[in-house]
Design a protein with these regions (language model features):
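Beta1-alpha1 glycine-rich phosphate/pyrophosphate-binding loop at the start
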Residues: 42, 47-54
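Short, compositionally biased
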Residues: 105-131, 135
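Glycine-rich beta-strand-centered segment in the early N-terminal region that forms part
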Residues: 24-38, 52-106
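Long, glycine/tryptophan/cysteine-rich extracytoplasmic
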Residues: 138-141
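OB/S1-fold single-stranded nucleic-acid-binding modules
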Residues: 2-9
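Conserved small/polar residues in nucleotide/adenosyl-binding loops
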Residues: 144-151
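Short, solvent-exposed secondary-structure boundary/capping segments
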Residues: 45-47, 92, 116-117
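A short N-terminal beta-strand-loop micro-motif at the entrance of redox/enzyme domains
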Residues: 9-44
């Protein structure tokens, strides 16, 4: 697994964390997604600059970060569920939402509808709901309609 990390005090300094992830280590009611694509824009740079002030570093704590010097700048993107222990979320579902610049992310879906769910992982509970909501693209009418017109 690879994860792009930024030095919180100087976002021009970066590193790639490489480690193993055991896709079978997953609790009941959790899912693991593989991040497929994301966008990195000027807006994301502002997330890094305001990371501590606005709480952006709390969304996805950096791995192997004992001294809390490194962070993961959040990005909007697409992912696919590759492992699920949640009875309402199926493997191979596609999602749109807030992701770290990483290969994988573990989520704990709650308040599930056909169109979306919230992530209930404890370190994100006090963060803005809009950034904790994941669209379930297979159930999103507008997305399905757009995909039907692809050639």
């Amino acid at each position: 697994m690879k994860e792009f990390q930024t030095l919180k005090g100087d976002i021009t300094k970066t590193r790639i964390f490489e480690g193993e992830i055991d896709l079978d280590v997953i609790d009941d009611d959790e899912i693991i997604v593989r991040v497929e694509t994301f966008s990195f824009t000027a807006n994301n740079i502002s997330y890094g600059v305001a990371g501590d002030t606005l709480g952006y570093w709390q969304f996805f704590p950096a791995k192997e970060n004992i001294d809390d010097q490194w962070g993961c700048i959040p990005m909007w993107g697409f992912a696919k569920v590759i492992s699920s222990r949640h009875k309402e979320i199926q493997e191979n579902e596609r999602l749109f939402g807030y992701f770290p610049p990483s290969d994988y992310l573990k989520l704990k879906p709650t308040k599930i509808t056909e169109q979306n769910f919230l992530d209930a992982v404890s370190h994100r509970k006090d963060l803005p709901i809009i950034s904790n909501k994941y669209l379930r693209l297979d159930g999103a009418v507008s997305y399905t309609h757009l995909r039907a017109h692809e050639t």
